[in-house]
């Protein structure tokens, strides 16, 4: 279990050591939980609820011994500790007791990335039609080109052999006001 201590200052208190901020990994979902404990509560057992999975854990802090810089923390999970992923009962003989295990980087749960959707048939048609109208008449304002493209869309039936196409021979030319070439 990775535990990290970081003293912080809250906005409501003036002393720089008003509370300690601890980073604790949830034993169920491995989410890093930031727990701020006021100094007056340092000897109490604090209940921590994971915001991701709802697991309740109890965080117990002990005061530092003389010569010790960091606090020792004990975290007991309230149910579900038997369901840890990758837990094993055997200890590794290759690790030496002189060297503490290297801390792994914190595990951060990120929201899933939004998938880029393909443009609709209307959006593709309008983009191509405005581009075609502006290439035929570069001085036309975008507003008029959009209006002409919208009128052409009203006459366009997708996936129809007789519909107008951006490169076809049935295209309404010019500004698209119903004039056929």
UniProtKB/Swiss-Prot annotation:
Per the record, the coiled-coil ranges are none
Tell me which CDD domains the record gives. Answer: HMG-box_SF
Pfam families in the cross-refs: YABBY (PF04690), YABBY_N (PF24868)
**Skewed-composition ranges (Low complexity):** 87-99
Q: Quote the InterPro entries the UniProt record gives.
A: HMG_box_dom_sf, YABBY, YABBY_C, YABBY_N
Enumerate the GO terms in the molecular function aspect: DNA-binding transcription factor activity; sequence-specific DNA binding; transcription cis-regulatory region binding; zinc ion binding
Q: What tissues has this protein been observed in?
A: Restricted to flowers, mostly in carpels and nectaries. Expressed at low levels in sepal primordia (buds), sepal receptacle and developing petal. Not detected in placental tissues, septum, stigma and ovules.
Among its keywords, does the record have Zinc-finger?
yes
What's the main place this protein lives?
nucleus
Annotated segments matching region Disordered: 80-122
Instruction: Please list which residues make up the signal peptide.
Output: none
Q: Name one GO biological process term.
A: regulation of DNA-templated transcription
One Gene Ontology cellular component term attached to this UniProt record is: nucleus
Compartment(s) where it occurs, according to its Swiss-Prot or TrEMBL record: Nucleus
Q: Where is the composition biased (Pro residues)?
A: 100-109
Q: State the conditions that upregulate or repress this gene.
A: Down-regulated by SPT and by A class genes AP2 and LUG in the outer whorl. In the third whorl, B class genes AP3 and PI, and the C class gene AG act redundantly with each other and in combination with SEP1, SEP2, SEP3, SHP1 and SHP2 to activate CRC in nectaries and carpels. LFY enhances its expression.
Briefly explain the null phenotype: The double mutants crc-1 rbl-1, crc-1 sqn-4, and crc-1 ult1-4 exhibit strong floral meristem (FM) indeterminacy with reiterations of extra floral whorls in the center of the flower.
Q: Which domain of life is it from?
A: Eukaryota
Which keywords appear in this protein's UniProt record, sorted alphabetically? Developmental protein, Differentiation, DNA-binding, Flowering, Metal-binding, Nucleus, Transcription, Transcription regulation, Zinc, Zinc-finger
Gene3D superfamilies per UniProt: High mobility group box domain (1.10.30.10)
What the record says about family reads: Belongs to the YABBY family.
Its biological purpose is as follows:
Transcription factor required for the initiation of nectary development. Also involved in suppressing early radial growth of the gynoecium, in promoting its later elongation and in fusion of its carpels by regulating both cell division and expansion. Establishes the polar differentiation in the carpels by specifying abaxial cell fate in the ovary wall. Regulates both cell division and expansion.
Know the name of this protein? Protein CRABS CLAW
């Amino acid at each position: 279990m990775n535990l990290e201590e970081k003293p912080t200052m809250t906005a409501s208190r003036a002393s720089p050591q008003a509370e300690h901020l601890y980073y604790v990994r949830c034993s169920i979902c491995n989410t890093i939980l930031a727990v701020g404990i006021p100094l007056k509560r340092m000897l109490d057992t604090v209940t921590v609820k994971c915001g991701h999975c709802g697991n309740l854990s109890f965080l117990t802090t002990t005061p530092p011994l003389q010569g010790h810089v960091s606090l020792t923390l004990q975290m007991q999970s309230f149910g579900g500790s038997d369901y840890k992923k990758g837990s094993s009962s055997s200890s590794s003989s290759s690790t030496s007791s002189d060297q503490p295990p290297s801390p792994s980087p914190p595990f951060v749960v990120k929201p899933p990335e939004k998938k880029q959707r393909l443009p609709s048939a209307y959006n593709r048609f309008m983009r191509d039609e405005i581009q075609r109208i502006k290439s035929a008449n570069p001085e036309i304002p975008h507003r008029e080109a959009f209006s002409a493209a919208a009128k052409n869309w009203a006459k366009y039936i997708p996936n129809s052999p007789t519909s107008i196409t951006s490169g076809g021979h049935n295209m309404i030319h010019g500004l698209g006001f119903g004039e056929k070439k």
